[in-house]
């Protein structure tokens, strides 16, 4: 069983990318579980046809400790198992703690069955606080992929996440598997992301072009592969799935200084 965490700044379409990636992997014969680790609880919406899934934390609040697995785990597109950890009540508590509670509960309830090929953690990535770093810190996820684009804040967040990976890689087995570019159609975007990934000592594992097919599929509460399986964008996600499944480049990243990051941005014309 490979356990992967997908990180990236808020709004970069991590959840969309993760769900479309898992749809590609399930077509390749893999059994998958997706654990949403974002308080928005939207990590499994496209796999469940838009059903708002009850989160682990909401279930615990309503039912107490005596929770059955089928009340927090739903089966979605092509048999993908879906869980949302959820978040605390606004203004109270720490969302990161919710991730810890949820993963521990899934382990206790036997969700991590031997037939699973992949478990994905879809994690809010702006804040690499202790709780959100939990899949890295506790050694749950061995592979990290960072979703980024050619925008400055996306790269700033990706560099910060790399610092978190570097910190925990020394004590655990976690490694960076690569950068996934979710294109924003920025000038020189491919070249910039490729240079950024290489500077970290990693790779740009796939460049996902911007496409209206993604929005159409989302409006219909489906992944692109389910909604329009023959379109070009569906093939992009299939290619991403193939590359992730066949990936053998796992590194401890070498995060860059703020000055070096800005230098790379200048070299590619993003800042003057």
Curated annotation (Swiss-Prot):
The keyword Oxidoreductase applies. SUPFAM superfamilies: P-loop containing nucleoside triphosphate hydrolases. Binds 1 [4Fe-4S] cluster per dimer. The key enzymatic reactions in nitrogen fixation are catalyzed by the nitrogenase complex, which has 2 components: the iron protein and the molybdenum-iron protein. GO terms for biological process: nitrogen fixation. This is Nitrogenase iron protein 2. Keywords: 4Fe-4S, ADP-ribosylation, ATP-binding, Iron, Iron-sulfur, Metal-binding, Nitrogen fixation, Nucleotide-binding, Oxidoreductase. One of its GO terms (molecular function) is nitrogenase activity. ATP binds at residues 8-15. It catalyses: N2 + 8 reduced [2Fe-2S]-[ferredoxin] + 16 ATP + 16 H2O = H2 + 8 oxidized [2Fe-2S]-[ferredoxin] + 2 NH4(+) + 16 ADP + 16 phosphate + 6 H(+). PANTHER family: LIGHT-INDEPENDENT PROTOCHLOROPHYLLIDE REDUCTASE IRON-SULFUR ATP-BINDING PROTEIN (PTHR42864:SF2). Its EC number is 1.18.6.1. Homodimer. Its cofactor is [4Fe-4S] cluster. The modification ADP-ribosylarginine is found at residue 97. It is an enzyme of class 1 (oxidoreductase). Belongs to the NifH/BchL/ChlL family. It comes from the Bacteria. [4Fe-4S] cluster binds at residues 94, 129. The reversible ADP-ribosylation of Arg-97 inactivates the nitrogenase reductase and regulates nitrogenase activity.
């Amino acid at each position: 069983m490979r356990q992967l965490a997908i990180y990236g700044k808020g709004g970069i379409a991590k959840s969309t990318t993760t769900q479309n990636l898992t749809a590609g992997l399930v077509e390749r014969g893999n059994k998958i579980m997706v654990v949403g680790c974002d308080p928005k609880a939207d990590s499994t919406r496209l796999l469940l046809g838009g059903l708002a899934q009850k989160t682990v934390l909401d279930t615990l609040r309503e039912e107490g400790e005596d929770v059955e697995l089928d009340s927090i785990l739903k089966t979605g597109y092509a048999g993908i198992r879906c869980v949302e950890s959820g978040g605390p009540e606004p203004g109270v508590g720490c969302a990161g703690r919710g991730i810890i509670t949820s993963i521990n509960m899934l382990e206790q309830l036997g969700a991590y069955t031997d037939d699973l090929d992949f478990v994905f953690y879809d994690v809010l990535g702006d804040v690499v606080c202790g709780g959100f770093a939990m899949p890295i810190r506790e050694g749950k996820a061995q592979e990290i992929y960072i979703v980024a684009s050619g925008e400055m804040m996306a790269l700033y967040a990706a560099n910060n996440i790399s610092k978190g990976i570097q910190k925990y890689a020394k004590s655990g087995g976690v490694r960076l598997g690569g950068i996934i570019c979710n294109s924003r159609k920025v000038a020189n975007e491919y070249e910039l992301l490729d240079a950024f990934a290489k500077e970290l000592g990693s790779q740009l594992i796939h460049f996902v072009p911007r496409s209206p097919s993604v929005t159409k599929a989302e409006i219909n509460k489906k992944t692109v592969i389910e909604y329009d399986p023959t379109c070009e964008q569906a093939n992009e996600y299939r290619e991403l799935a193939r590359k992730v499944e066949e990936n053998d480049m796992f590194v401890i990243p070498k995060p860059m200084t703020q000055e070096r990051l800005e230098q790379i941005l200048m070299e590619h014309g993003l800042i003057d």
